[in-house]
Amino acid sequence: MKRFILFCLFMSAPLFADEELSPQQTVENYFEFFNNEDRASLNASSGNPFVFVIGGKPTAYPKYGDAVDFDGMKASGWSYSRIHKNELIYQDDISAMVDINFSRYNNDDEVVSTTDVVYLLVMRDGSWKVKGGFVDGNLTLGRD
């Protein structure tokens, strides 16, 4: 009986190993939610408060959804974003940082802007949450 229980434990471990998304996968999902203008999923995948440091200016928002204005984004020419580089800087049990380079594109698939950002993620209730973004240079969130 003891062997059977051990067998079941070892066999079930891989089933649960894939349930937790990596920090890099979490950021990829975050970009997908952004492209879909899915404010509820963005808020669910981010920590509260959410902090952006853009061009050296730190701003805290109650939720990520409070930081972005999709109508303003569209007015700036944005249609969608695409990640070019997604590198894990570090990861421990409670935090991680991911280095991202991405571009924003317009409706004609032309690059509107290209930006480097480092995202800070925290582990909350068994899931990675995007807690903050550190943007090199300027980046509109549609509220300008």
Regions found by a protein language model. Give the residues of each.
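Short beta-strand edge/turn micro-motifs at domain boundaries
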Residues: 114-144
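Beta-strand elements of well-folded, non-transmembrane domains
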Residues: 35, 104-106, 121
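Short, low-complexity N-terminal intrinsically disordered segments enriched in polar/charged residues
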Residues: 8, 12-40, 44
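A mature extracytoplasmic/lumenal domain signature
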Residues: 46, 56, 100-104, 117-119, ...
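Hydrophobic pocket/interface hotspot
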Residues: 30, 41-42, 50, 98, ...
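Sec-dependent signal peptide recognition
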Residues: 1-7
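A short gly/proline-enriched turn/hairpin at secondary-structure junctions
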Residues: 46-61, 76
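Surface-exposed, charged secondary-structure patches
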Residues: 67-110
